[in-house]
């Protein structure tokens, strides 16, 4: 998270400490999202500026919903509460095959990144289902290639969107 509380919550959730239940995990991530919305997103939007962030509600739906088997509908209600209804106008989903993502992660992995391959596949499938269900908000960009190529594709996508 981009807040002090968010950093603490994420360290607790993704570190070596006690493993939360699936529902507790979703609630803790929602607390992080609520704090981030209140401290970062809402004030930035109120100031008339854009917000660019690396995670959004799609992560909750993909990881806790599709990955953990929690109700996507219930999670969306939780997201709506946590974000006070403030959702992104554009979500860029970088399409990277799981084996390539695994190589890019290298040796340092958090608890979620260390899950079994089946979990990763469910999460990936979940992201694509979300993108397919809301094509006005989600754009899929090829994430294969070096960082400059991928960044150029993301920028081109943004330019075409705005």
Name what the model sees in each region.
Residues 59-126:
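A glycine- and Lys/Arg-enriched "phosphate-lid" helix/loop adjacent to the NTP-binding pocket
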Residues 48-49, 88, 135-138:
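A generic structural signal for alpha->beta connector loops
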Residues 32, 56, 96, 145-146:
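Short beta->alpha linker loops
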Residues 99-162:
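NTP-dependent small-molecule kinase module
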Residues 52, 90-92, 139-141:
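Hydrophobic/aromatic beta-strand patches that form the interior of the parallel beta-sheet core
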């Amino acid at each position: 998270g981009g807040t002090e509380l968010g950093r603490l919550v994420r360290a607790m959730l993704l570190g070596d400490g006690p493993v939360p239940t699936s529902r507790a995990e979703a609630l803790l991530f929602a607390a992080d999202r609520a704090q981030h919305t209140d401290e970062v997103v809402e004030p930035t939007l109120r100031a008339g500026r854009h917000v660019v962030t690396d995670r959004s509600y799609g992560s909750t739906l993909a990881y806790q919903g599709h990955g953990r088997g929690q109700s996507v509908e219930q999670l969306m209600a939780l997201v709506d509460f946590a974000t006070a209804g403030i959702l992104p106008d554009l979500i860029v989903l970088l399409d990277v095959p799981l084996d390539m993502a695994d190589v890019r992660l290298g040796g340092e992995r958090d608890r979620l990144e260390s899950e079994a391959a089946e979990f990763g596949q469910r999460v990936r499938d979940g992201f694509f289902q979300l993108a397919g269900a809301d094509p006005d908000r989600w754009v899929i960009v090829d994430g294969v290639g070096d960082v400059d190529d991928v960044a150029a594709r993301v920028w081109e996508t943004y330019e075409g969107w705005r």
